[in-house]
């Protein structure tokens, strides 16, 4: 629910009458959108209406298939990753995973939750899964497992007693 991902949702929602989905854990962040906008010099940001709480679903119909909704909290409480393809070959990770990095936790996130998400949810994903992040270049899980210091144990995300 950070500004850089949801700041333009309300005017789009109003103009196009499209639904908005977000992980329910991000409701408090979303409620602060107008204030966060002011902190970055953006006046008049409005909080969008949530039409679908992603915490309540595991899949969303899409064309002739489905998008798998995988809960990946840590960067934000309601963080989700979206997997496409029969075996989740393509992933939209938002800020849960970047090429050679991960999202920050100091704006409503939780480093310990994030470390568990990495260990229990992200690391088990197949090596062939394409990683499309909210910022920066794309990658694959194989590259991230090998080279990302937050995934391969070189850097600690904030929970030193949690074995990765």
Report residues per predicted region.
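Active-site HxH/HxHxD metal-binding segment of metal-dependent hydrolases
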Residues: 1-65, 146-154
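Metallo-beta-lactamase
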Residues: 32-40, 59, 66-71, 76-164
């Amino acid at each position: 629910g950070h500004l850089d991902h949801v700041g333009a949702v309300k005017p789009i929602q109003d103009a196009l009458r499209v639904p908005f989905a977000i992980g329910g854990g991000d409701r408090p962040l979303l409620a602060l959108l107008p204030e966060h906008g002011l902190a970055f010099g953006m006046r008049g940001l409005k909080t969008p209406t949530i039409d679908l709480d992603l915490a309540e679903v595991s899949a969303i119909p899409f064309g002739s298939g489905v998008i798998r909704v995988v809960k990946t909290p840590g960067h934000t409480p309601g963080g989700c990753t979206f997997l496409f393809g029969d075996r989740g070959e393509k992933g939209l990770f938002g800020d849960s995973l970047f090429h050679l990095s991960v999202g920050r936790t100091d704006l409503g996130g939780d480093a310990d939750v994030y470390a568990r998400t990495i260990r229990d949810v992200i690391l088990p994903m197949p090596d062939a899964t394409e990683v499309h992040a909210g910022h920066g270049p794309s990658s694959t899980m194989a590259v991230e497992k090998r080279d990302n210091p937050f995934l391969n144990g070189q850097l600690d995300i904030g929970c030193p007693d949690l074995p990765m």
